[in-house]
């Protein structure tokens, strides 16, 4: 039997092309994941009684984009704060990685209902470098707008209208206040409402207790389903781990810590562990109770990223000469808002289709009725779309 050398070679080149296509964002994914965990720990450290919810991908994208206009320390600080090691990855590859990532997330045929945007707002007196505007548009599909910050109310209205329009009215009044001396502001938003591959029955949802802490219990609508789930108890994390797929290449991973093990879980989570979970398909029967919730997070990134060492860009010593050559410029305000709805829905018609054979043994009852942590991962790129913690589902 003679190998067909042509065919073999053709196959080889084909796979290498395929790898190239996927390799750029693979290079940035571990950094994004570690950035997600550092940011999460930072927020958890500030308060253990509030919900946490943010989009690592979205924040990192906004600041990688901003780094295009920065120089010197301001520049390296941003990329290092996002967990990139510039001795290991050339900067061009970082931007290529984000470009691929955005391309994947914004595919028009995607069933993922994900809306994300970055708006840069500069005072009308600032003359912006053309190259910066081009890069922002070309690499990051974003826009820079000229506003009159001296008229604070009008500027605020313009920024909020941009976000409201971009999120189809889901996020209103994002910016509550602006300093009079603002010359440069960044807003970054992301909104997601996914559909489960396997929906829950609306009729099964019942009000149940959720134990916020030892002293506090609240009533929440609890979705319930007895079925086959990708769920298991992880000894290393002392937690139940549940993976649930959304239509359109996203997976939610929920972590329910054993009694008193929440902090242990928060400290132990790593990119490698998450990768292992995603590779492991481990279906078993369970009686699942998961709260229905709408969760939002709004963060002043100046404070949050400051704790991760990104401070220069917000200070008078900022070097944003790639944005404007006129006068010294600093970023006065950076706001991030993330919104997620978790409900029973799958595809509208799929309601009655799932008849599952449940094994005879008694399935464990897994109730997410106390604080839990969750991540949402985009399957193709393995990147963390969202990370959060639900301490109190009724918290507005």
Swiss-Prot record:
One of its GO terms (biological process) is regulation of proteolysis. Residues 1-24 are annotated as: Disordered. InterPro entries: Serpin_CS, Serpin_dom, Serpin_fam, Serpin_sf, Serpin_sf_1, Serpin_sf_2. Plasma. It is found in: Secreted. Residues 14-24 have a biased composition (Basic and acidic residues). This is Alpha-1-antitrypsin. It comes from Chlorocebus aethiops. The lineage of its organism: Eukaryota, Metazoa, Chordata, Craniata, Vertebrata.
């Amino acid at each position: 039997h003679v190998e067909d050398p042509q065919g073999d070679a053709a196959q080889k080149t084909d796979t290498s092309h395929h790898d190239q296509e996927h390799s750029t964002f693979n290079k940035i994914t571990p950094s994004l994941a570690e950035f997600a965990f550092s940011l999460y720990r930072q927020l958890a450290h500030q308060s253990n009684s509030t919900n946490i919810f943010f989009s690592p991908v979205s924040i990192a994208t906004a600041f990688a984009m901003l780094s295009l206009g920065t120089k010197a320390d301001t520049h390296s600080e941003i990329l290092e704060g996002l967990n990139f090691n510039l001795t290991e990855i050339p900067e061009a590859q970082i931007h290529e990685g984000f470009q691929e990532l955005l391309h994947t997330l914004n595919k028009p045929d995607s069933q993922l209902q994900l809306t994300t945007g970055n708006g840069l707002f500069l005072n009308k007196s600032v003359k912006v470098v053309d190259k910066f505007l081009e890069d922002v548009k070309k690499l990051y599909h974003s826009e820079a707008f000229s506003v009159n910050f001296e008229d604070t109310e009008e500027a605020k209205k313009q920024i909020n209208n941009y976000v409201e329009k971009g999120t189809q009215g889901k996020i209103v009044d994002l910016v509550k206040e602006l300093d009079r001396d603002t010359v440069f502001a960044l807003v970054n938003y992301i909104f997601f409402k996914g559909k489960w591959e396997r929906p829950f029955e609306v009729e099964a949802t019942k009000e149940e207790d959720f134990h916020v802490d030892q002293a506090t219990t609240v009533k929440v609508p609890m979705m319930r389903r007895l079925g086959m789930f990708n769920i298991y108890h992880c000894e290393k994390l002392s937690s139940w781990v549940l993976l649930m797929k959304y239509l359109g290449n996203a997976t939610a991973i929920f972590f329910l810590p054993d009694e008193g093990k929440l902090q242990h879980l928060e400290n132990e989570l790593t990119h490698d562990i998450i990768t292992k979970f995603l590779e492991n398909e481990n279906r078993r029967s369970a009686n699942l109770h998961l709260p229905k919730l709408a969760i939002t997070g709004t963060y002043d990134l100046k404070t949050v990223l400051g704790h991760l060492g990104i401070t220069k860009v917000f200070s008078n010593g900022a070097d944003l000469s790639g944005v404007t050559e006129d006068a010294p410029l600093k970023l006065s305000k950076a706001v991030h808002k993330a919104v997620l709805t978790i409900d029973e829905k799958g595809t509208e018609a799929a309601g009655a289709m799932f008849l599952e054979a449940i094994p005879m043994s008694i399935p464990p009852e897994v109730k997410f009725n106390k604080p839990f942590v969750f991540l949402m991962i985009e399957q193709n790129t393995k990147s963390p779309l969202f990370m959060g913690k639900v301490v109190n589902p009724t918290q507005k």
